[in-house]
Each structure stands twice: as C-alpha cells, then as structure tokens.
Amino acid sequence: MCPLSPASHNRRTGRPRSADADRAILAATREALAELGWSGLTLGDVAARAGVAKTTLYRRWAGKNELVVDAVAALFEEQLELPDLGSLQADIQGVVLRFAALLDRPETKTALMACIAEATHDDALRLRIRDAIVDRQKHLVLTGRVRAQQRGELPPDDGPADPARDDLIFDVVAGSVVHRVMVSSQPVDDAWALRLARLLVVGLAGVHNGP
C-alpha cells in the first residue's frame, strides 16, 4: 500500500515522528469527529483523547482540515486492499465487498461524510481529499489490471499509460459503492457485488478494446 504522509508542505521541525503517536492521533480524530461533528472538533480535544500534547499535532499537521483528511485516508490505507482471488471478476467482487464494509463502519461513514460536506465550500479541502484519499487508492486499478493481464483475462497494454481510462474504472467502482452505501443506504451483499463485478468485467473488455 502507499505510505501515508500526514504532514503539510510546511511541516515544522521537531522531534522524530512516532508511528504509534500518529496512529493514536488519527484514531482519536475519527472518534472525536463521530461524537462532535466537524464544527465541534478541535485539535485540543484530539490531543487530549490521544494522550499527547497539542504541540505534537501542530508539528505534524497545519490545521484541522489536514488532520481530518489524513485520519480518513489512514483507514483506507490500512483496510482497503485488492484480494487475489484467482480471477478478475472475483477480485472485483472481493474489493467491492471490502470497500462497502469499510464505508459502513460508523467512524468511516461519519468522517467521510463530514469531509465531503465541508469540502463543498472549501476548494483546498476538496483537493486534499482527492490527493490523500482518492488518488492514493487508484493503484488498486493498476494492480487488478496487471493481474488480469498476467492471467490472460485482459490483453496487454499496447501503448502509453492511459490515466483517463484508469480514472474511469476507479470512478465506476468507487462511485457505485459509495452511492449504494452512503446515499441510497442499500446493502452491498455478495449478490450485488457479483452483479457489479460481472458488469465491470464486460465493460473492461470494451474499455481495453475501444478507442
């Protein structure tokens, strides 16, 4: 998985980073966000919950936006993987089920919805969400395609990389699951995940063979 780097470009210098402290801070951030909401969350409250000094947070994050986005991103980095289940269809079904289960966790759902709501009027936050959460998970598309090509399920690439194609595949998978779980509040069970996987396998063949 891609390493998580929660600091901003102007990170202050200080003592060496502690992975344990980072994990505690990010977990405390998600907990506080679920209880207090975006407007009620403060770095002081997060520091108290994590058992660290508030200055520790300011050495790592420029402010609340950066901290909350990285707290959400950490869940995806730690929990979301593309399983190798022997076929492209099975791999897609597996990652869909894992993604849905992750989104259905109260801490994920609350934190992600808070980020999205706040980002509707904060362009910088929206860009940070894209960079820290969305773009970092697009490697799952690349991994799945390489596996499928090695199995002979998809043809090898015959030209330069096509980021637009990868974005389309990612958007179809992620958008379908996010809408199902967080908008329509419908279950993502084995049957639904299988139907989506079958649809995607047919569509992927068209994407790879089309213009």
Which stretches of residues belong to each language-model region?
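C-terminal peripheral helix-coil segments that are non-catalytic and often amphipathic
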Residues: 1-13, 143-150, 167, 172, ...
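Basic, helix-initiating cap at the start of DNA-binding domains
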Residues: 1-49, 55, 66
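Amphipathic alpha-helical segments used for helix-helix packing
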Residues: 66, 71-72, 104-131
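Hydrophobic alpha-helical connector segments
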Residues: 80-109, 162
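Short amphipathic alpha-helical segment with a characteristic S/N-K-E followed by hydrophobic residues
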Residues: 25, 40, 63-68, 78-79, ...
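Amphipathic alpha-helical packing segments from all-alpha helical-bundle domains
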Residues: 110, 123-151, 167
